[in-house]
From Swiss-Prot:
Co-factor note (free text): Binds 3 [4Fe-4S] clusters.
Origin species: Vibrio campbellii (strain ATCC BAA-1116)
GO biological process: electron transport chain
Name recorded for this polypeptide: Ion-translocating oxidoreductase complex subunit B
Pfam families, A to Z: Fer4_21 (PF14697), FeS (PF04060)
Keywords: 4Fe-4S, Cell inner membrane, Cell membrane, Electron transport, Iron, Iron-sulfur, Membrane, Metal-binding, Repeat, Translocase, Transport
Cleaved signal peptide residues: none
Subcellular location as annotated: Cell inner membrane
Length: 197
């Protein structure tokens, strides 16, 4: 047998042994999670922005499962509150944040002031800032949630939160506001009024 063939067989055997050990360990030491926390976490927007007062969406989901309010997530908006209310079987509350008057903002980096320290990149929970050490940084506008966690760590104050320009794509279209009348209900109402006459 050649040396290469022996090395391949030995590596394959080691891989099989370590794979079996990892497989056994994943079954033996499996952590059982609360299924309601997983369901709540799947409803939350996963921006990890911290605007709810928790360090991310998973800790907030755990807090909701333990009885905290369901209306603390600004990126999720009223739609998320309603989904959480349906899941938890509680009344849908108004958002704890003023969502209507708050204009959506995104971070903007003044590149002439940026020193490339990467502190904003480290603070961004959604990786919306790109750049490198001692290089210019920029914000990916479509990824930015407007949480403004990147503003405070900047030593040169080169980050500004600017309002997002309203376009046809970002306009709050009320597409579900079209009233739909159930024909059978209308017909029954007409029969009732006819029988009263």
């Amino acid at each position: 047998m050649s040396t290469i063939l022996i090395a391949i067989i030995a590596l394959a055997a080691l891989a099989a042994v370590f794979g079996a050990i990892l497989g056994f360990a994943s079954i033996r030491f499996k952590v059982e999670a609360d299924p309601i926390v997983d369901q709540i976490d799947s409803i939350l927007p996963q921006t990890q922005c911290g605007q709810c007062g928790y360090p991310g969406c998973r800790p907030y989901a755990e807090a909701i499962a333990n009885g905290d309010q369901i209306n603390k997530c600004p990126p999720g908006g009223q739609a998320t509150i309603e989904k959480l209310a349906d899941l938890m079987g509680v009344e849908a509350e108004e958002s704890a944040h003023d969502l209507d008057s708050k204009v959506k903002t995104v971070a903007f980096i003044h590149e002439d002031m940026c020193i490339g320290c990467t502190k904003c990149i480290q603070a961004c929970p959604v990786d919306a800032i790109v750049g490198g050490t001692k290089a210019l940084h920029t914000v990916i506008k479509d990824e930015c949630t407007g949480c403004d966690l990147c503003v405070a760590p900047c030593p040169t104050d080169c980050i500004e939160m600017i309002p997002v320009e309203t376009t046809t794509e970002s306009w709050k279209w009320k597409l579900n506001a079209i009233p739909v009348v159930n024909i059978t209900d209308a017909a029954n109402a007409a029969n009732v009024t006819d029988s009263i006459k």
